[in-house]
Structures are given as C-alpha cells and as structure tokens.
C-alpha cells in the first residue's frame, strides 16, 4: 500500500520532496494563502525591499497615483506572490493575477488590461515566460497606458488604439536573466528577494503555528527553521508535518525533541538536506571520487533527469558550498565530505576548490 499526502502528488522523486520549493498541490496553495501576512507590518524578512516598498507605496497613495511597475526576482518560495498581494492591499486596490505561460495570445493580455480599474495591480508570475508577441503589446501598455489591437481579418483588418486606466504591473521571476532588456527597463522598482535567516524563519514558524493553533515553543520553532533551507514555503510545510507528528506521537505540542524526531522521520537532516541531496553528494564522492563529473553521469548514477538535478537539487547544495559547478564538471567540496563523515582526499584536495 502506498501513501500520498498533499505534498507528494507527483511521481518524480524530486517533485515529491518535502523540501521542494514548489507548491505541491491546490490544497497546499490554499493553506499558504491562509498563512500569508496581510500587510507590510506583518511581513517578516526582506528588510531592504520592505523599507523601499513602504516609501514608494506611501508616496503613490499620497499622490493618488498608480505605483511604478515592480519587478520581484529571486529563488522560488521566498514570497513574491505574497508580496504582490500585500502591495495591492497596502494600495487599497484590486489585484488581478495571471502567469506568463497562460498568456498565449495578445488578446489574452488585452482582455485583462481593458478590465483593470484605475490604479489596480496586475501580477504576472513567471513573467520571463511571456511569448514575444504578447510582450510586444505590453510595452505601450506599461509606458503610455495604451494598447493597439487588430479588428477583423484579412484585407479588412485594421488596428485600433485603446486607452487603459493607469495600473501597476508586478512581474515575478526566478530567472531575471531571461528577461529581455526592453521589458526589464520598463520596471521602475526592482527588488531582489534573498534567502531568509534562521531567526527570520523562526519568527515565521511561530506566527504560522499561532494561526494553525499549534502550541510551539521557541526551541521547537528554531529546529524547524534551521532545516527550512532559507525558504518560508518549506518552513510552513515542515511545520505542518511536524504538527501531524506531534498530534499522533506526542501531546500536540511542538518542542525541540518532537521537531527533531519528526524531521528525522522525514529524512530532513540538520542542514535541511533530504535523501535526494545526500544521494547526489554520495554519488559524486563515492562513485566519481569527488569529481569532476559531468551532469549526465550524475543523472545516470542517481536515476534522475539532468534538468531536475540542475534546476531543483543542485542550487541549494551550491549555494551552501557543498558542490561546485566547474567547466570540467561537478566537484564535491570539503564541506560535502565532512557532512557525509568521509575524509577528503589529500592528493586532489586542490581540486575541491577549483572554480
């Protein structure tokens, strides 16, 4: 018999990870919405971006103007969607939400733009995935609040100009480098979201535990925060799984001991690594002598797709200094050897830190 929770909906091992930064199901997305802060005062972390937005939003409200267009970029799970909702709420306007892949044709975007009210916010997630033809009609909308649309077909077709209400576009992306220069240049406010500190995540866990009515002491919240990989989405997911464990194996309260046992059951170690992380490091170290090793060889060794390794598993290991990408392939660092309890090689030690 197999068991699936709301967090384990896909057949791919990487997609089923409890430490995945992607929302796993509509049910999880609904829970995320319930846990979202409603205003900047409740928003934890991203101090620089929060301070800037407080000023820009306050100024726009005083002038009764639309806020400048906003680009939010950074790794997944850090709160770009949450921040877009907060911006709209702070401005006191409506929010219309869509995503780049959904806007397949110019008419799809035109239908949304023409229905926006004055100073409304349009949030486009994965904006780097807009098609070029859709992006083209977005330019005059952002600059002049106008769009040109074609009426009719064939020789009788003609272009008409439609005036739009002033609005704010919030674009979110995990890959800012994939944005075209003309699109990037049209954002007046650009904010990079960074990974959260353990202290910030502990505050988020404490707040979410309160909303979920789960008694959680400081040490228990801190234990969850330390294993959340700097990402609020993961912190809230781990909190819910630890809550389940506490209610079945304990008295319903979350302390450090209960959190540690629950996370050990989930195979999430003190560094926030799961089975897939350790599997990759073990393959590089034990099967390929620490590297360098090509991506395809690693993929074959652990039975995972190359794209999944590159986009889903590797980034956190690289960011934490356990793995390096070099022109010759992947190399395990000394930290990776220590984490697995293996002595680093002495003869090729210099390769561990090659760039």
Curated annotation (Swiss-Prot):
Q: Where is this region: Large ATPase domain (RuvB-L)?
A: 5-196
Question: Which GO terms of the molecular function aspect are on file?
Answer: ATP binding; ATP hydrolysis activity; four-way junction DNA binding; four-way junction helicase activity
Q: Name the major location.
A: cytoplasm
Question: What ranges does the record give for the region Disordered, renumbered to this chain?
Answer: 1-26
What GO terms fall under cellular component here?
cytoplasm; Holliday junction resolvase complex
InterPro entries assigned: AAA+_ATPase (IPR003593), AAA_lid_4 (IPR041445), DNA_helicase_Holl-junc_RuvB (IPR004605), P-loop_NTPase (IPR027417), RuvB-like_N (IPR008824), RuvB_C (IPR008823), WH-like_DNA-bd_sf (IPR036388), WH_DNA-bd_sf (IPR036390)
- Which residues are noted in the entry as DNA-binding? 325, 330
- The UniProt annotation puts the region (Small ATPAse domain (RuvB-S)) at 197-267
Region of interest (Head domain (RuvB-H)), ranges: 270-355
Please note every region of biased composition (Low complexity). Answer: 9-22
Q: What is this protein called?
A: Holliday junction branch migration complex subunit RuvB
